[in-house]
From Swiss-Prot:
<comment type="pathway">
    <text>Glycolipid biosynthesis; lipid IV(A) biosynthesis; lipid IV(A) from (3R)-3-hydroxytetradecanoyl-[acyl-carrier-protein] and UDP-N-acetyl-alpha-D-glucosamine: step 6/6.</text>
</comment>
<dbReference type="GO" id="GO:0009244">
    <property type="term" value="P:lipopolysaccharide core region biosynthetic process"/>
</dbReference>
<protein>
    <recommendedName>
        <fullName>Tetraacyldisaccharide 4'-kinase</fullName>
        <ecNumber>2.7.1.130</ecNumber>
    </recommendedName>
</protein>
<dbReference type="GO" id="GO:0005524">
    <property type="term" value="F:ATP binding"/>
</dbReference>
<dbReference type="GO" id="GO:0009245">
    <property type="term" value="P:lipid A biosynthetic process"/>
</dbReference>
<keyword id="KW-0441">Lipid A biosynthesis</keyword>
<keyword id="KW-0547">Nucleotide-binding</keyword>
<dbReference type="InterPro" id="IPR027417">
    <property type="entry name" value="P-loop_NTPase"/>
</dbReference>
<dbReference type="InterPro" id="IPR003758">
    <property type="entry name" value="LpxK"/>
</dbReference>
<keyword id="KW-0067">ATP-binding</keyword>
<keyword id="KW-0808">Transferase</keyword>
<feature type="binding site">
    <location>
        <begin position="54"/>
        <end position="61"/>
    </location>
    <ligand>
        <name>ATP</name>
    </ligand>
</feature>
<dbReference type="GO" id="GO:0005886">
    <property type="term" value="C:plasma membrane"/>
</dbReference>
<comment type="function">
    <text>Transfers the gamma-phosphate of ATP to the 4'-position of a tetraacyldisaccharide 1-phosphate intermediate (termed DS-1-P) to form tetraacyldisaccharide 1,4'-bis-phosphate (lipid IVA).</text>
</comment>
<keyword id="KW-0418">Kinase</keyword>
<keyword id="KW-0443">Lipid metabolism</keyword>
<comment type="similarity">
    <text>Belongs to the LpxK family.</text>
</comment>
Length: 322
């Protein structure tokens, strides 16, 4: 229901009714920001925060992965911190290792650890400052720390802020919660160092973005399919015009389905689960075992223990400045 009222070009009646509450939300958020900034922790290691000003999936984690890969290619030593949404670690800060389950560290950290082939330290903590201090102590030669989300975590000083925007949803009706999808007023964009817009942006929205500096356009591109059971990799054309069942338990499943369709794949059925869904074998009961199942990387991480031979995930990359 909220999606229907939030993602309109103009606020509807319900949004207008909720606006007074949004003003209270903004006031509380501003006071919290000021309070946190007064006791901000400043690390000697440069910190990049990759976040957003709206709720829901915008594509932050692919950006974090891309940045880490770029730094590795340059011979630098990056580290990643995350809140670890949904994590149930025994204690914090918690370092992700090869034996860590997604239930312990959260979906995104587990996926990033797998995608970066254990080359990058990943530490989670609800209080990100704890994660930074852990890296400072245990990985003192770290060149840069990338924070996956945390734009509004003002307890932590940052050297660069990157905001990720979904080109389709953009900023919705441009109102703050609960009248709209924004965590902070849209004017916050004037303070950040870079804005990365992912997807096909309309000319109208591009005009809006001219008001802000350092806007970069990117597109999610399919790179290859990876078998969840065997880790075998095949070209993205392998499933051209084949029938598949698409599974998604992410913040914005429409983006995933669109990427599949752009790869000339015939989706015979779509199964959508809530973001961060904890998959079990029972979720796949009733699915025709003869039809190929394709899901996101983030979902595949949680299905390894019961995956079938014809289950695959689609790996992606960002094509910048398309």
């Amino acid at each position: 229901m909220l999606d229907k009222i939030w993602y309109r070009s103009k606020p509807n009646l319900l949004s207008r009714v909720l606006q007074p509450i949004s003003l209270v939300f903004i006031d509380i958020a501003n006071k919290r920001k000021i309070k946190q900034q007064l006791k901000q922790y400043k690390s000697k290691i440069p910190i990049i925060v990759v976040g957003n000003i709206s709720v829901g999936g915008t594509g932050k984690t692919p950006v974090v992965r891309m940045l880490a890969q770029q730094y590795l290619a340059q011979g630098k030593k990056p580290a990643i911190i995350s809140r670890g949404y949904g994590a149930k670690a025994d204690n914090y800060p918690f370092e992700v290792t090869s034996g860590t389950l997604a239930t312990q560290c959260g979906d995104e950290p587990a996926m990033l650890f797998d995608a970066l082939q254990a080359q990058v330290p990943i530490v989670i903590a609800p209080e990100r400052v704890q994660a930074v201090k852990y890296i400072e102590k245990n990985f003192p030669d770290t060149d840069i720390i990338i924070s996956d989300d945390g734009l509004q975590h003002y307890k932590l000083a940052r050297d660069k802020e990157i905001v990720v925007v979904d080109a389709i949803r953009m900023f919705g009706n441009k109102l703050c919660l609960p009248a709209g999808p924004l965590r902070e007023p849209i004017e916050r964009l004037k303070e950040v160092d870079q804005i990365i817009v992912i997807g096909n942006c309309s000319d109208k929205d591009k005009e809006l973005l001219k008001n802000y500096k350092n806007v970069t356009y990117a597109k999610v591109v399919a790179t290859e399919f990876v078998n969840i059971l065997t880790a075998k990799k095949v070209a993205k054309t392998e499933f051209n015009h084949q029938n598949v069942i698409a599974i998604a338990g992410i913040g914005n499943p429409t983006k995933f389905f669109k990427t599949l369709e752009e790869s000339a794949i015939n989706i015979t059925a779509k199964k959508v689960f809530k973001d961060h869904h904890k998959f079990t074998q029972s979720d796949f009961e009733g699915i025709d075992s003869d039809i190929t199942v394709v899901m996101t990387y983030k979902d595949a991480i949680k299905c390894k223990n019961f995956a079938k031979a014809n289950w695959w995930y689609l790996d992606i990359a960002l094509d910048i400045n398309v």
